[in-house]
Amino acid sequence: MKKIRILSLFIFTTILTSGTFGQDLKVNSNGLDIYYRIMGKGLPILIIGGGPGDVSDRYLSLCELLSKDFQCILVDQRGTGKSTPAQIDSSSISLALTIEDFEAIRNHLGFKQWTVLGFSYGGFVAAVYTNDYPTSVSSLIHMGSLGFDFNVYRHFSDNIVSRLHPGDLELLKYWSDSTRMATDKHHAIVETIKARMPGYFFSREKALLVTQTMKDSDFNLSLGDYLWDDMYKRSLELLKKNSDFDKPVLILHGRQDPLGESVAQSLSRYYKNSKLVFVEKSGHYSWIEQPEKILAAIKAFLSPTK
């Protein structure tokens, strides 16, 4: 039994760290080179990762999973990774520019339409993209999406902290100390993210494995300064009425996601043609905890009607 457990953990670690990363490609969008990678063949799926500020490497495992059956396009969003401008300010970082970057990639690749998958914060970005460029999107997938009501952050954070063990809370307190924040704020904040990570997951073992792969360079924490106000304004616009987007929408949500079920249910009501799937025994990072279920759900969603 112990050998089986060790083997399963090895396989899971391989999912997080291995694979063909794809060739670095780029397109110029509004004066900035936006870098992206393509993995797999078939129906194109744009992956919009979370954050704001996550580098695309954090979602390689998702892209690798989908590349078994689809063509996955993974982007270093504006301000992250290789797509970082010389100067980060309101002139170089905005939600509108980020959306235009996606359009630049789609046009460069010659896709009339593509499926858009947004995770967490990326789900909000995907909703804005779909609203602004509905003819560019053939279908939409929300995965652990934040939705549009930012009040969820209150219980999201509470739910995460409520799941932490005493050792996690000690680490959180240690790295939240003002002295450590003053010494190296970026590193300290990343360590607090790592300390909170078990609260995002159903499986503590998998959460701890994820923390082992996390690096300071995985995050550009300054992007929120230039995006949150914009996001709030766009969320109010989106909430004024239900979406006019009438193409298929899949909402994948971990049953144990600390966001709670109401976010996914609200999204399901928001779209005319939506399907809501709760992923059992899964927290926020559903493709890491239940990869087979996620791939099966997406394959069923994107398969042509027979």
What is the role of each PLM region?
Residues 274-306:
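Catalytic active-site module of serine/aspartate enzymes centered on a nucleophile-bearing elbow/loop
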Residues 32-85:
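Conserved HGGG/HGGXW glycine-rich cap/lid loop of the alpha/beta-hydrolase fold
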Residues 112-155:
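Conserved hydrolase catalytic core segment
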Residues 258-263:
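Conserved alpha/beta-hydrolase "acid-adjacent" motif
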Residues 179-225:
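Conserved alpha/beta-hydrolase catalytic His-Asp/Glu region
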Residues 77-119:
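Active-site loop/oxyanion-hole signature of alpha/beta-hydrolase fold enzymes
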Residues 140-178:
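Flexible "cap/lid" loop of the alpha/beta hydrolase fold
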Residues 245, 251-253:
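Short beta-strand/loop motif that positions the catalytic acidic residue
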